Amino acid sequence: MGSTNTNMTERRMLLPFQAVANFFKEPSGPKCPECVSVIIDDACPNLDCPLKVTEWITRWCSPEALNIPGLGQPEAEQLAKLGLVLHPGELYGLSPGDWARIEGVSADQLDEIQRQMEDSKSPKPSALLHGLRLPGVSANMAKRLIEEIGSIDSLQETKPNRFQEIDGIDEAMAFEVYRWFRDSVNKQALKMLDQIGFNFTD
């Protein structure tokens, strides 16, 4: 009897430790091919995943968005993997030393990139919105959102039920767009872009 009680006591003492071990156990499931974080809701949750950052910078520089042709996917990939940028707002604060770390970019090319970046600061609202890479928001949907809501500032205050009233936006997408504006990294990007001089009010 005494031995049984001892075993039960030992098992009870182990329970809290087992709970802690389970809490810190690495989650299972498919992993991001770039940063090997476990995929959640069909997306990599890692905010500084180089693949996610590369895709965002590439979208930002595309002709349908901010039109910075000198910054293509190879350059965006290097910027992301070197940890020089987390979002497009940080592109505009890179130092000459940062750019010097990007292979394959000559001094003349860098001058052209910086000219293109300066020209990019007065985009159409829909092009700016498309460049922000909201989930499910294509170039056409960006135009529709601006037509319906009015400005990026207004979009930040829009509730999911209002998004659902727009043709082509279902409940899931409405929530994702709403949630995008409340993400800490996205809010940081918007704040930095606003400080640079991008217009979110028109």
Question: Model regions: which residues?
Answer:
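OB-fold and OB-like beta-barrel modules that bind single-stranded nucleic acids
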Residues: M1-G2
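Accessory alpha-helical DNA-binding modules that contact the DNA backbone or grooves
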Residues: T9, L14-D202
